[in-house]
Amino acid sequence: MTRSIKKGPFVDAHLQKKVDEQNEKGTKNVIKTWSRRSMITPDFIGHTFAVHDGRKHVPVFVTEAMVGHKLGEFAPTKTFKGHVKDDKKARR
C-alpha cells in the first residue's frame, strides 16, 4: 500500500535541513546519511548523497528521474556473487 497523497512525502528533518543549507550557500558537497527511508524531492536534484547500505556509504547522485523514489532504492544492501557453476565432471 502506498503513502496517502494528503500526507505528502516523508523526508527526515535533519536531511532536509542539510539540503536547504547547501541550496542557500550554493554548494554541492556530499551529504552523508543513514536515512534510506526518505523520499527524494525536487530540491534534492543535483546533490550527491552518501547512503548507508549497512556496511559502507554508497554515493548516489540525484537526477530528475529519481524524484518520488526513496534514497534506499539506489543503495543495494546485498551483493550478488553469482551462481556457482555446476561442475558435473568433478563429481564422477
UniProtKB/Swiss-Prot annotation:
This is Small ribosomal subunit protein uS19. Transmembrane segments: none annotated. Belongs to the universal ribosomal protein uS19 family. Protein S19 forms a complex with S13 that binds strongly to the 16S ribosomal RNA. One of its GO terms (biological process) is ribosomal small subunit assembly. GO terms for molecular function: rRNA binding; structural constituent of ribosome. PROSITE patterns: RIBOSOMAL_S19 (PS00323). It comes from the Bacteria. The keyword NAD does not apply. Keywords: Ribonucleoprotein, Ribosomal protein, RNA-binding, rRNA-binding. GO terms for cellular component: cytoplasm; small ribosomal subunit. InterPro entries: Ribosomal_uS19, Ribosomal_uS19_bac-type, Ribosomal_uS19_CS, Ribosomal_uS19_SF.
